[in-house]
């Protein structure tokens, strides 16, 4: 009994010594890590900063701050947009022109049939940019045609004025030439008459005698 008791005590002492050695070893390892950490040999453990909006992780607080500023700007822009754009559109029921039409058939018409008609009405009332550009092109082409017509009219008027002026000058020249011819004919007739009177001196004497007789 004494031997077994002594053996148990010896075993306990050995286990305590081993545990003490293990504890001292762990303490030594911790002290070595702490010394290396103070000396700067062990870096800081990496820390991730998560965004509260999109749960994106960043390695530095500065990067997270810049990312949060972007989210704040987006929220400020959304606040400036009017709220009625985000509300669902409530379509008013279209009045039935036929009074004999039953209410059951009108209730069976769904919004799926109403929406295409509304889109068609909007497409009719509000022209698209392509239609606007077509209108601009048509107006510009019409304006160009009108300008060309005005130019052609002015050219025709100028031609007619020139033609009338040329005709007037030609008629004046013709009248002048006719007057010259008539004057020449009168001069020739007078010359002939004078010549005839000079050629017949008897007639002249006869006139003088008659005057004396009277």
From Swiss-Prot:
<dbReference type="GO" id="GO:0003700">
    <property type="term" value="F:DNA-binding transcription factor activity"/>
</dbReference>
<keyword id="KW-0805">Transcription regulation</keyword>
<dbReference type="Pfam" id="PF13912">
    <property type="entry name" value="zf-C2H2_6"/>
</dbReference>
<keyword id="KW-0863">Zinc-finger</keyword>
<keyword id="KW-0804">Transcription</keyword>
<keyword id="KW-0539">Nucleus</keyword>
<keyword id="KW-0479">Metal-binding</keyword>
<keyword id="KW-0341">Growth regulation</keyword>
<dbReference type="InterPro" id="IPR013087">
    <property type="entry name" value="Znf_C2H2_type"/>
</dbReference>
<comment type="function">
    <text>Probable transcription factor that may regulate cell division and growth.</text>
</comment>
<feature type="region of interest" description="Disordered">
    <location>
        <begin position="1"/>
        <end position="27"/>
    </location>
</feature>
<dbReference type="InterPro" id="IPR052426">
    <property type="entry name" value="Plant_dev_regulator"/>
</dbReference>
<feature type="compositionally biased region" description="Low complexity">
    <location>
        <begin position="102"/>
        <end position="111"/>
    </location>
</feature>
<feature type="region of interest" description="Disordered">
    <location>
        <begin position="89"/>
        <end position="130"/>
    </location>
</feature>
<dbReference type="GO" id="GO:0008270">
    <property type="term" value="F:zinc ion binding"/>
</dbReference>
<protein>
    <recommendedName>
        <fullName>Zinc finger protein 11</fullName>
    </recommendedName>
</protein>
<feature type="compositionally biased region" description="Polar residues">
    <location>
        <begin position="117"/>
        <end position="128"/>
    </location>
</feature>
<keyword id="KW-0217">Developmental protein</keyword>
<feature type="short sequence motif" description="Nuclear localization signal">
    <location>
        <begin position="72"/>
        <end position="79"/>
    </location>
</feature>
<dbReference type="GO" id="GO:0005634">
    <property type="term" value="C:nucleus"/>
</dbReference>
<feature type="zinc finger region" description="C2H2-type">
    <location>
        <begin position="49"/>
        <end position="71"/>
    </location>
</feature>
<keyword id="KW-0862">Zinc</keyword>
<dbReference type="InterPro" id="IPR036236">
    <property type="entry name" value="Znf_C2H2_sf"/>
</dbReference>
<dbReference type="GO" id="GO:0006355">
    <property type="term" value="P:regulation of DNA-templated transcription"/>
</dbReference>
């Amino acid at each position: 009994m004494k031997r077994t008791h002594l053996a148990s005590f010896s075993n306990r002492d050995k286990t305590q010594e081993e545990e003490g050695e293990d504890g001292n070893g762990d303490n030594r390892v911790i002290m070595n890590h702490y010394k290396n950490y103070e000396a700067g040999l062990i870096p800081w453990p990496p820390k991730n900063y998560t965004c509260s909006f999109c749960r994106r992780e960043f390695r530095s607080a500065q990067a997270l701050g810049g990312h949060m500023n972007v989210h704040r700007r987006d929220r400020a822009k959304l606040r400036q947009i009017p709220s009625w754009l985000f509300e669902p559109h409530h379509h008013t029921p279209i009045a039935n022109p036929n009074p004999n039409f039953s209410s059951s058939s009108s209730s069976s018409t769904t919004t799926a049939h109403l929406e295409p008609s509304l889109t068609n009405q909007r497409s009719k009332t509000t022209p698209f940019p392509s239609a606007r550009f077509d209108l601009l092109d048509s107006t510009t082409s019409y304006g160009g045609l009108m300008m060309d017509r005005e130019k052609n009219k002015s050219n025709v008027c100028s031609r007619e004025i020139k033609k009338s002026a040329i005709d007037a000058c030609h008629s004046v020249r013709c009248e002048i030439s006719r007057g010259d011819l008539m004057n020449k004919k009168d001069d020739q007739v007078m010359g002939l008459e004078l010549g005839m009177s000079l050629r017949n001196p008897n007639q002249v004497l006869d006139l003088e005698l008659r005057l004396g007789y009277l």
